Design a protein with these regions (language model features):
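Well-ordered alpha/beta subsegment
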Residues: 111-141, 145
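Short, highly charged C-terminal tails/helix-capping segments
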Residues: 159-165
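Short, ordered beta-strand-loop transition motifs
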Residues: 48-55, 77, 115-120
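Long, continuous compositionally biased terminal/linker segments
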Residues: 62-88
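Charge-rich, low-complexity N-terminal segments
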Residues: 1-70
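Ordered, soluble secondary-structure elements with a strong preference for glycine-centered loop motifs
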Residues: 28, 92, 96, 134-141
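Short, internal acidic amphipathic alpha-helical interface segments
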Residues: 82-123
């Protein structure tokens, strides 16, 4: 009888663990909402990727000044969603000279942040905060359009600064 009770307890614990795993994460809910919005509005060219359990992303491209730039929409379990555009890869010599101009851009456009990642890529990041129940995929895609408009205006000046040094 004691073994029977123990077996039932183990089965109940296993059932609880399974239920917890089935519960959809906030990141997955955000990604699903973005995919449904993109499908409903016939937005193509999107690749859905899972980096790990916490970070999911949409990989796409932006055409700016004749260049095809990688754009990632990163969702996770935090209140933030990130737009990350990878603009150019710098050599070691170009990094120091470019940082000053990137700081100027950061001061001019507070909602955007230019940085250089460890691989030497100049990355433009746009953070979009939204509470769990306030996530709006339409806003995310509208901000992708704003990011593209910003790059259409400022990308050539950035590239001139980089290649002139």
């Amino acid at each position: 009888m004691a073994e029977e009770i123990k077996d039932n307890e183990v089965k109940e614990e296993a059932a609880e663990v399974t239920e917890a795993k089935v519960e959809e994460t906030l990141a997955m809910k955000k990604l699903t909402a973005l995919k449904e919005f993109a499908d409903a509005h016939e937005i193509g060219g999107l690749q859905y990727l899972q980096i790990n359990e916490e970070n999911l992303l949409i990989n796409t491209r932006l055409l700016v000044e004749g260049q095809t730039l990688p754009l990632f929409i990163v969702v996770n379990n935090s209140v933030y969603t990130y737009l990350q555009a990878h603009l150019v890869t710098l050599t070691e010599e170009k990094k120091a000279a470019t940082l000053s101009y990137l700081n100027e851009l950061n001061n001019e456009f507070n909602m955007l942040k230019y940085s250089i990642n460890p691989q030497g890529n100049v990355v433009l990041i746009f953070s979009i905060p939204a509470g769990d129940d306030k996530f709006d995929p339409a806003l995310v895609f509208a901000l992708v359009d704003q990011l593209k408009a910003h790059l259409d205006t400022h990308y050539s000046a950035l590239m001139e600064k980089i290649w002139s040094k």
